[in-house]
A protein has these predicted regions:
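Alpha-helical cap/lid subdomain in secreted, periplasmic
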Residues: 1, 20, 52, 56, ...
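Bacterial Sec-dependent N-terminal signal peptides
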Residues: 1-21
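Conserved SGNH/GDSL esterase-like catalytic core that processes O-acyl groups on lipids
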Residues: 21-27, 32-121, 157, 276, ...
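Secondary-structure boundary elements
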Residues: 310-377
Length: 407
């Protein structure tokens, strides 16, 4: 019996210590943080989603106040709200601040803009006083869509000015800056009322904060343009860039070049290759301690983007001379990256699944760099193909053609 009691006491003590060691995250903000506009903010707001992503080691609390301004002389200053006092009492180990949207109101920014940086720095100081070891993260604001009633009467411009002020605050305070604007801006449908993100948008915000806190950006990733058989531009410094987990060492190797960099806190990294002469084939290797990406049969030469509508999309097999030219199309040093449209832009009604895909910017089918053959040249842009052949004949270097035409 004593052993059972002792075991119970030990388990209880471990549970208490575990609870005490949870990392507290305070989400400070306005109605967007609060979850206004969501059908069920108790399950859909970004702090709730963040809690699920971070797991039991973290305790996330929502201190969003609808209508709150950062400006202390604004129409509803956050620092005068009960949510602010609760956030201070919470004394979070991490404080994530997303304020500024309501400061675009004509009652606020035109009159008190000069106080914004000062007021923001003061707000940060109060959280540092509540917990001297606190980690502060501030966010560039979510977008405001052009459907907003005041968008053209000042809101658009003031929104941009406030973004710049927020960046200034981050530099002065020496704190981490995250971006809620970039991941939401391409998706206006995620802002149904032009201001408040829908549930999917809130999930994107949560993922942004999760990555900022943990440094987890999903590991080493590059653009789909990087594949075997690709061509890189000759005779110019070449930027190679991608995503990795924050702080990870990234090594880029090609030919006799070897470059090492580290992923920034936002996961982004880049290196600039020294100019390469036309030739190859080479292997481009990009690696972190946890992943290696190797691209083979890479050539250095001329790279051209062939974009447009139906005239550019018009395929080689549709030309009068296609039957004669297609059998002669094989060329190991001509490479094609053919981006075919997922759906035709004909006068037909698209169903809901197509519209959903388009809303998610899924315009093109997946593709990769290919060596030019009669089979793939037949379905490639005729204009682009003949242009590429002309370059091959005159320059005597490898040529890469990227076609993203949609008729």
């Amino acid at each position: 019996m004593k052993k059972i009691l002792l075991l119970f006491v030990c388990l209880f003590v471990c549970w208490v210590l575990s609870a005490q060691q949870r990392i507290k995250v305070a989400c400070v903000g306005n109605s967007i943080t609060y979850g206004t506009g969501l059908s069920d903010r108790a399950t859909q707001s970004y702090p709730v989603k963040l809690q699920k992503l971070l797991g039991e080691r973290y305790e996330v609390e929502n201190f969003g106040k609808p209508g709150a301004t950062l400006l202390n002389q604004g129409h509803r200053p956050y620092t005068r709200q009960e949510e602010y006092r609760k956030a201070l009492d919470f004394a979070g180990d991490i404080v994530v601040i997303h304020l500024g949207i309501n400061d675009t109101d004509p009652r606020n920014w035109p009159n008190y803009r000069d106080f914004f940086v000062k007021d923001y720095l003061k707000l940060i100081d109060t959280f540092r006083e509540a917990n001297p070891a606190v980690r502060i993260i501030i966010a560039r604001m979510t977008p405001i869509a052009d459907r907003h009633i005041r968008f053209l009467s000042g809101t658009r411009d003031w929104h941009g000015e406030i973004q710049t002020a927020i960046e200034t605050v981050a530099r002065y305070a020496g704190i981490q800056l995250i971006d809620f604007h970039e991941p939401l801006y391409p998706y206006p449908y995620l802002l149904p009322d032009a201001v408040h993100p829908a549930a999917e948008g809130a999930a994107i915000m949560a993922r942004t904060v999760y990555s900022a806190i943990t440094g987890d950006y999903g590991g080493l990733k590059l653009s789909p343009l990087y594949t075997d058989n690709m061509i890189l531009q000759r005779d110019t410094p070449l930027k190679v860039h991608g995503i990795a987990n924050a702080g990870e060492q990234v090594t880029v190797c090609i030919d006799r070049q070897r470059w090492i960099t580290k992923a920034a806190p936002d996961g982004k990294w880049s290196v600039k290759l020294s100019p390469l002469k036309a030739g190859g084939p080479y292997t481009l290797t990009i690696s972190t301690p946890h992943r290696i990406l190797k691209y083979t049969n890479v050539l250095i030469g001329e790279v051209w983007l062939c974009s447009g509508q139906s005239n550019m999309e018009f395929m080689l097999r549709q030309t009068i001379t296609g039957k004669k030219d297609i059998p002669q199309a094989a060329d190991e040093q001509l490479r094609l990256y053919d981006m075919k449209a997922r759906w035709r832009t004909d006068a037909v009604q698209w169903d809901a699944s197509v519209l959903d895909s388009l809303n998610h910017l899924q315009y093109y089918k997946e593709t990769e760099w290919e060596i030019c053959t009669p089979a793939n040249a037949a379905h490639f842009s005729a204009i682009a193909y003949y242009f590429g052949q002309m370059l091959r004949d005159s320059l005597k270097v490898p040529v890469g053609l990227i076609c993203n035409a949609i008729g």
